[in-house]
UniProtKB/Swiss-Prot annotation:
Pfam families, A to Z: ATP-synt_ab, ATP-synt_ab_N, ATP-synt_VA_C
Listed name of the protein: ATP synthase subunit beta
Domain of life: Bacteria
Lineage of the species this protein comes from: Bacteria, Pseudomonadati, Thermodesulfobacteriota, Desulfuromonadia, Geobacterales
Keywords from the UniProt entry: ATP synthesis, ATP-binding, Cell inner membrane, Cell membrane, CF(1), Hydrogen ion transport, Ion transport, Membrane, Nucleotide-binding, Translocase, Transport
Description of how the protein assembles with itself and partners: F-type ATPases have 2 components, CF(1) - the catalytic core - and CF(0) - the membrane proton channel. CF(1) has five subunits: alpha(3), beta(3), gamma(1), delta(1), epsilon(1). CF(0) has three main subunits: a(1), b(2) and c(9-12). The alpha and beta chains form an alternating ring which encloses part of the gamma chain. CF(1) is attached to CF(0) by a central stalk formed by the gamma and epsilon chains, while a peripheral stalk is formed by the delta and b chains.
UniProt subcellular location: Cell inner membrane
Organism: Trichlorobacter lovleyi (strain ATCC BAA-1151 / DSM 17278 / SZ)
Family: Belongs to the ATPase alpha/beta chains family.
Length: 471
C-alpha cells in the first residue's frame, strides 16, 4: 500500500496545517509523522495528531513535540492509525512519553501489544456497580473521606501544600500493602519532581509495580493534553486483560485542561469563561468516563487538582468536581499549623461516607469527629475576642478534644522519612476508628495534646505521653 504523503502549509506554534491530495485526508485523531532535525537526527521523529479538517485537502494538527526547525513544504507521512502506547507488564518500572517512547535511557520497552490512546469508555453492561471502600493507611482519609474502589478522587490544594507527597505515599502504601499495580501520569508538572518520584520509587522498591508516563512542564501543549490518555490506556490494559485493580495517579489534572486551553485558541475556537476552551467539559468527560470499575477489574484514580489562586469556582477545578466520588481538600491554614498531611477534615467529602457502605461504627465515629471539629471552628471567634476563660466548662472540653483530634489527624509518611527523620506509619482502619472513638469519648482527656502529634495508632500517642511526662 502506498503511503499517504502531505506537506506542511503553515506552522503556528504547536499547531501545524498539512495539505494532502484531494480525497486523501487522514481521519481525525490519526497520527502523522514528520522529520524535525531540531529534536534529534532520527527520521520522522515528530508526531502530529489530526485535530480538524479544513476544507477539501487540508488538516490542522497538534504537535506532540517541539516544532522549532520545521519548514513549509516539508513532507508529512500519514501513519493510518492513532497514537498508540505500549501496554503490558513490560511497561512496569519504565518511564515513557506521550507517544510511548521510553525516556529513561533503559532501551526499548519491547512490549507485545499496543493500545490506541483514544478509546471508548466501557459499555454500561460491562461496568460494575459494587461499592466498597479502599483502605489507604492514611488516618484522615480512611476515617473522614474514604476512597471507593474504582472511584475517582480529587486532591485539591494550592501550590506547596503537599499534593505530590500525598500521592507518593499512596503509591507506596498500595504497592506495599496491596501488591497492586499503579500507573502514574505526570501531566505538566515539574521535571525535578518527576525525577525525584522515579528515584524514590526505585529506592523504596515500588518501581517494579508502577508504570510512569510523563509529559512535563517543558513539553509543548499537545503532549500535555494527551499524556493522561496514554497513561489511561496503560491502566486499561491491566484492568481489562489482566483483571487487576489498578491505581491511576494523575498529577496534575488541571494541567490537562490548561494544555487544552493553550491549543484551543490556536485551533481557532472561540474561548469560553475565563479564557478556557469551549470543549472543556467534553474533554474532561471523555477522559473521566474511561476511569471506572468493570466486572473484570477496576481503575481507582487519584487526581491532584491545582486550584488557580485557591479559587474553587474556577471552571477547571469546578468541571473536575462533577466527576469525583471523593474529594481530599488540602488546606494552607492546616499546613501552617505544621499538621501534615494538611487535609481539611471538614471540607473533604466522600460519597461512600454512608453507614450502609462503611458500617455504623465507622460512620458514627467519623460524624462525631466532624461535630467536635466544627464546634471548635464555631468557637474560634469567641476565643479570639474573649479568650478561653469565657467559655463554659463543656466548651473548654470540646476545644481540648478538638485540638487533640486535629493533631491526631497528622501522620508521619514513609516517603517523607528522609526529611522528617520520623519513620512512616501505615495505620489499619480498625486502629484509626478505635483511636478517634477513644478521644471523642474522653478516654484521653488527661494526656497532653502534643502527644497526639505525628504518631500512628492511639497506643503510640499514649507511649509518647509517657515519654513526655518522664522528661
Amino acid at each position: 500500500m502506498s503511503q499517504n504523503i502531505g506537506k506542511i502549509s503553515q506552522v503556528i506554534g504547536a499547531v501545524i496545517d498539512v495539505e494532502f491530495e484531494p480525497g486523501k485526508l487522514p481521519e481525525i485523531y490519526h497520527a502523522l509523522r514528520v522529520t524535525n532535525p531540531a529534536i534529534d537526527d532520527r527520521e520522522n521523529n515528530l508526531v502530529l495528531e489530526v485535530a480538524q479538517h479544513l476544507g477539501e485537502n487540508s488538516v490542522r494538527t497538534i504537535a506532540m513535540d517541539s516544532t522549532d526547525g520545521l519548514k513549509r513544504g516539508q513532507a508529512v507521512i500519514d501513519t493510518g492509525k492513532q497514537i498508540c502506547a505500549p501496554v503490558g507488564r513490560k511497561t512496569l518500572g519504565r518511564i515513557m512519553n506521550v507517544i510511548g517512547e521510553p525516556v529513561d535511557e533503559m532501551g526499548p520497552i519491547g512490549n507485545e501489544k499496543e493500545y490506541g490512546i483514544h478509546r471508548e469508555a466501557p459499555a454500561f453492561e460491562d461496568q460494575s456497580t459494587k461499592v466498597e471502600a479502599f483502605t489507604t493507611g492514611i488516618k484522615v482519609v480512611d476515617l473522614l473521606a474514604p476512597y471507593a474502589r474504582g472511584g475517582k478522587i480529587g486532591l485539591f490544594g494550592g501550590a506547596g501544600v503537599g499534593k505530590t507527597v500525598l500521592i507518593m505515599e499512596l503509591i507506596n502504601n498500595i504497592a506495599k500493602q496491596h501488591g497492586g499495580y499503579s500507573v502514574f501520569a505526570g501531566v505538566g508538572e515539574r521535571t525535578r519532581e518527576g525525577n525525584d518520584l522515579w528515584m524514590e520509587m526505585k529506592e523504596s522498591g515500588v518501581l517494579d509495580k508502577a508504570a510512569l508516563v510523563y509529559g512535563q512542564m517543558n513539553e509543548p501543549p499537545g503532549a500535555r493534553a494527551r499524556v493522561a490518555l496514554t497513561a489511561l490506556s496503560v491502566a486499561e490494559y491491566f484492568r481489562d486483560e489482566e483483571n487487576q485493580d489498578v491505581l491511576l495517579f494523575i498529577d496534575n489534572i488541571f494541567r490537562f485542561t490548561q494544555a487544552g486551553s493553550e491549543v484551543s485558541a490556536l485551533l481557532g475556537r472561540i474561548p469560553s469563561a475565563v479564557g478556557y476552551q469551549p470543549t472543556l467539559a467534553t474533554e474532561m468527560g471523555e477522559l473521566q468516563e474511561r476511569i471506572t470499575s468493570t466486572k473484570k477489574g477496576s481503575i481507582t484514580s487519584v487526581q491532584a487538582i491545582y486550584v488557580p489562586a485557591d479559587d474553587l469556582t474556577d471552571p477547571a477545578p469546578a468541571t473536575a468536581f462533577a466527576h469525583l466520588d471523593a474529594t481530599t481538600v488540602l488546606s494552607r491554614q492546616i499546613a501552617e499549623l505544621g499538621i501534615y498531611p494538611a487535609v481539611d477534615p471538614l471540607d473533604s467529602t466522600s460519597r461512600i461516607l454512608d453507614p450502609q457502605v462503611i458500617g455504623e461504627e465507622h460512620y458514627a465515629v467519623a460524624r462525631s469527629v466532624q461535630y467536635v471539629l466544627q464546634k471548635y471552628k464555631d468557637l474560634q471567634d469567641i476565643i479570639a475576642i474573649l479568650g478561653m476563660d469565657e467559655l463554659s466548662e463543656e466548651d473548654k472540653l470540646v476545644v481540648a478534644r478538638a485540638r487533640k483530634i486535629q493533631r491526631f489527624l497528622s501522620q508521619p509518611f514513609h516517603v517523607a522519612e528522609a526529611f522528617t527523620g520520623s519513620p512512616g506509619k501505615y495505620v489499619e482502619l480498625k486502629d484509626t476508628i478505635k483511636g478517634f472513638q477513644e478521644i471523642v469519648a474522653g478516654k484521653h482527656d488527661n494526656l497532653p495534646e502534643q502527644a497526639f502529634y505525628m504518631v500512628g495508632s492511639i497506643e503510640e500517642a499514649i507511649e509518647k505521653a509517657a515519654k513526655l511526662a518522664a522528661v
